């Protein structure tokens, strides 16, 4: 006889329910519940429950709920595409940050009008209130159903497809399943290979937008066919969608590539190649200010500065393991030093040299260059080291993803007893320095071992991971797990910073490493005279100078605080006869290492002021007849407010004070507050 009731836990409360109960019945009164979490796994709302299950609701406007709704939107989009283009072949349709995409193989690239047609068809499908229904299938059944879909067949036959993050939306390691789109009459009108979960019904997709299309290689490989990737976004409400679109508009205004060109900061000449930035004088001024302050703070925290070459013999990266684990991200080798006699016979074998992708192996050689004592530990080595990483040309993006980058790279060698305290002080140092650059809203991410890509023992990884987790929790910042996200040599904490418009950027990383000291046979003489392995900590505060520059440029929308601004003071004389007085004052600022310019152009004064305002300079100094007669200058700030007739000695001290304090000043009120403190 079938069991009449089962015992389950709902929202932490024990309940007895009928054995046929699903989430539909449990949460019938709350129409915002679109799925359930059963024993920690997201499942469809109508999934059968078993005795002993723990069940929690998933609301549409929650993080999990939005992901489920966006994935359902990919199915609606794919259905719409196949209705408009019946011969379209389906790829994968994963959820991404704030949206989703689906890959299609079609005869011609989609045009903007095509995307409008697809969006209209999606609206029709959503209004038709189709239900999503899951069914499990065997591999044989799946292959039969997808006989005319070559990309789906590839996923079905690939036993490791579930390890691919994009393909994992389609393929589960446990079983294969389809989702049928069922109309009101109970007819299956469309289907897709998918692991789920999905919405109960298309009508829950209340606010969506098709955004754009782009070419993309199938499964990210240049060896595979080119697909058309259609991007979209979906939100719980129309208000949320509108807010997202507003954020996109603001982000477009702040795009560092756009600002970089407008402000004459940097460029990417075709003659040099993709992902290789050239910083112009104004951009280099910002870089220098960033690096100078970083150097100052590292000296105060007892770091030893080192410098290493840009290329090295390949054997170094054999020792470190990079050639095994990271070769695809390295530039091809240069075979050098080979010598031949007159007959072409090799008399001296050459060696493969590589552009360095990372600084850590060279820092290990510095540690190893002589015997080390426990009295020297912790030893903190620091370098602004330029590294080179091969990114596909289609994947480079402004300064945030480049091929040549400079890291503020530190490697710290300490004892296991020092490890916890060193990590704690290091995280504090990192967060304080980021705050000095104007980033104040953080959370931490803990990246743990990828079981398919790591070196070292499980015990060592567990110790390293637990120590990092403990330090992260003691910071009182939010800690988010990143399963399988660590590099092959150790777990890491990354600092995620939210910018002025709420976007999240990964900035600093702190990585614990028990592995490389073993591979390099690093040792120190302990207090008892024994030889011991040091613990190694990798740390990049900026991540890379280029990326952090881009983050700051977008965070401030080009209006850097005075200490970072490429031009800190711009002088604008009301007329030519007042220029000498202004030039004398500007010279006194330049003697204090303030970055200044004067507008000597023939433009009218009004145009000069408009041009100066567009330049985002923190201090525009104006000199007219009254200013000259009173040995004064007048300030104009970014918001248009002014302070008139400030004596030159006072003005000089106030400008230097604001620069020294590293505060943001956009108005006369900001300025007065900064100099009054």
Swiss-Prot record:
Its main location: cytoplasm. Zn(2+) binds at residues 360, 411, 538. It catalyses: tRNA(Thr) + L-threonine + ATP = L-threonyl-tRNA(Thr) + AMP + diphosphate + H(+). It is found in: Cytoplasm. It comes from the Bacteria. GO terms for molecular function: ATP binding; metal ion binding; threonine-tRNA ligase activity; tRNA binding. CDD domains: TGS_ThrRS (cd01667), ThrRS_anticodon (cd00860), ThrRS_core (cd00771). Binds 1 zinc ion per subunit. Pfam families: HGTP_anticodon, tRNA-synt_2b, tRNA_SAD. Gene3D superfamilies: 3.30.54.20, Anticodon-binding domain, Bira Bifunctional Protein, Domain 2, Threonyl-trna Synthetase, Chain A, domain 2. Residues 255-561 are annotated as: Catalytic. Residues 1-59 form the TGS domain. Its cofactor is Zn(2+). Its EC number is 6.1.1.3. One of its GO terms (cellular component) is cytoplasm. Signal peptide: none annotated. One of its GO terms (biological process) is threonyl-tRNA aminoacylation. Keywords: Aminoacyl-tRNA synthetase, ATP-binding, Cytoplasm, Ligase, Metal-binding, Nucleotide-binding, Protein biosynthesis, RNA-binding, tRNA-binding, Zinc. Catalyzes the attachment of threonine to tRNA(Thr) in a two-step reaction: L-threonine is first activated by ATP to form Thr-AMP and then transferred to the acceptor end of tRNA(Thr). Also edits incorrectly charged L-seryl-tRNA(Thr). Belongs to the class-II aminoacyl-tRNA synthetase family. Homodimer. This is Threonine--tRNA ligase. The gene is thrS.
